[in-house]
Amino acid sequence: MSSATDHTSTAILAVDTGGTFTDLLLLADGVLTTLKVPSTPADPAEAVLAGSRKLLTEPRPHRLLHGSTVATNGLLERKGAQVVLVTNRGFEDVVEIGRQNRPQLYALVGHRPPPLVAREDRVGIGGRLGSEGEEIEALSEDELSALRDRVSHAEALAVVLLHSYANNHHEERVAESLQELGLPLSVSSRLLPEYREYERTSTTAVNAYVSPIMSRYLSRLDAESGAEAVHIMASNGGAVPVERAIREPVHTVLSGPAGGVVGALAWAKRSGFDQIITFDMGGTSTDVSLCPGRPLHTREFEIAGQPVAVPVIDIHTVGAGGGSLARVDAGGALRVGPESAGADPGPIAYGMGGRELTVTDAHVWLGRLPAEAFLGGERALKKALIEEPIEALAESLGKTPSEAAEGILAVANTAMERALRVISVERGFDPEEFVLVAFGGAGALHVVELAERLGAKRAMVPPDPGLLSAYGMLAAPPNREISRTLLISSRDLDLEMRLETTFRELEAQA
């Protein structure tokens, strides 16, 4: 559909790829045109390009803004590259030892996700720097020559040496030696020149792990989209050039959800509200974030059990969405998620071969989704297909089919309420003082009950809530965050001069 806006006539195409649907907005000649197409998980670029062709019926100059889940899914599904990590001899296991905190504190046998880099792919070399960047042991040129053969089987390389935040010369020399292999190369002093070697190593390994898949994906979009410029939504709420996203894909691991937060806050402020809790319920998961006038950021973030020490919008995610699967466990309890029907085959009501009940099917059974209005009328929902599975579930629960459907929604709401309380009540914020902003394809169907459970007095559903993350990309400013560790005593006579010099260098780099 289309709606008039006050924007300039510059053509901008914003695309948000979700687990179930890909959302597109075209802003051209003062008119905003929207489109939602099924995602293509096997080849995410296909849905983006196909949707773009539908909106851009004739070639015209335009810019592409894109939020992608490719890096996220690569990590969650462990479908990234084979990474070889080059580090100081004796420190090969830093990435596996990690910190002392344990996610399952009382488990008799704890389980931690394995590191992204296998033990045999962690290569230690000589050479050592001190904590102030002074050289203790020089690199061996003979060892660097032999190193190329030791890492040639890799699909991507990560270089992390101790104290490179204070002196990057050793890392740069190693990188120079490995460059001729032509492999994607992640260097910690370029990516995260900060102390704490575990977080720096983990972040660099994550970047290397998703680098090849993101490079292939974004390079194809850049080449085939026909856009004059391509910018990618970053996890911190800004937009970065596609070249940087290819080089540093770790900055895009929360790309899509960040767009939703930016878009929700923009709409809320237009409506006179600036204290909001965002509630983004899509087909696969639900993302929630608290914004006391602005998005909150964090640098203590984990994805798939891997610490990522880059700035991201503070977003909490649970595996409950419109496509979340409902089942009865061995103890007779009703469970919903985190498994999802995704875009293929999708919920049963889509008529695409799905056989397991989902949250969406429960809504269709209860008459909360009009069959003829799905995807703007392009596809009809098939309630009759749900009858047999919902009756089987109801029988196993000893309930009527409608009660079973209500139960599916209640279980999903409980998981989402818990996530909303984590970011509000558990952090000392009163939900009563915030507006709950619902978006995503399924958000509006659940927001009223969740607002009542939380005690929030107001709930807001923006126009086209299923497309709000794409709208957020239109509102996202270009930005570049640069950081560097500088260890210095407050008693140093040249403190102010060193700080001033460092800030000038950071500004020039940004």
Language-model-detected regions and their locations in the chain:
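N-terminally biased helix-coil "hinge/interface" segments that flank
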Residues: M1-A510
